[in-house]
Design a protein with these regions (language model features):
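Membrane-interface segments of envelope glycosyltransferases acting on lipid-linked substrates or membrane lipids
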Residues: 1-210
């Protein structure tokens, strides 16, 4: 069996996390298994399901509690867990690719970077780190994924983007969960007392991408 180590901040009900889970639930887990390295010290929304499906979850200190401890724990993790031959880091920017850098130093042969966004948010330092790491990402990762052409163009160096040295991985969704049901429609409208009203709903962040 192949075990792939997915690296991300948490496994709550965000876009990246739900994308991973949609794939995980529907793949052949007798051939490939996902494990998770998370920089959080809290139980996540998907924790119980992940463990039930046969995964291992490893937790390291969040960066907000000290980047030094975060790096030390990453070094310790990869020095102990030599069994992983594939690591797959999910990112919104290149501001934090330390896990991939340390994986490379520990000779992990397949190191995937997977972009899920088209801009850097938060502190201006993140913008600087994104631009800085963009200069070396081709030396750090071995495989380059993005959720769209725009994400690839923004995430990877111009020369790499123009050469087409990346793969577009479209976000998978479980379409059965969104199939129209008259029964469900009427049930929810009755519960919310909105039988004869036009309802427009939005469950995402009110941001440019949405």
């Amino acid at each position: 069996m192949i075990r792939v180590l997915h690296i991300t901040g948490s496994m709550n009900r965000g876009g990246i996390e739900t994308f991973i889970m949609n794939i995980y639930r529907n793949m052949d887990r007798e051939k490939v298994q996902f494990d998770f390295l998370l920089w959080t010290d809290k139980k996540c929304d998907y924790t119980d399901e992940i463990l039930r499906l046969g995964s291992k979850i490893y937790n390291i200190s969040p960066r907000r509690k000290g980047i030094i401890n975060n790096i030390k724990e990453l070094i310790n993790f990869f020095s102990k867990h030599k069994e992983y031959r594939i690591v797959h880091q999910h990112v919104n920017s290149l501001s934090y690719i330390t896990p991939l850098k340390i994986a490379k130093k520990n000779n992990v042969p397949i190191r995937i970077i997977h972009g899920h966004n088209i801009q850097v948010g938060g502190h201006p330092l993140n913008q600087y780190l994104h631009r800085f790491n963009k200069l070396s990402i081709r030396k750090i990762a071995t495989d380059f994924f993005a959720c769209s052409e725009l994400a690839a163009k923004w995430l990877y160096p111009t020369k790499q983007y123009l050469a087409g040295d990346y793969k577009i991985i479209k976000n998978a969704i479980d379409i059965d969960s969104f199939t129209y049901s008259e029964t469900v429609r009427n049930k929810i409208r009755n519960e919310l007392n909105i039988q004869d009203k036009l309802v427009i709903g939005h469950i995402g962040r009110v941001s440019y991408q949405k």
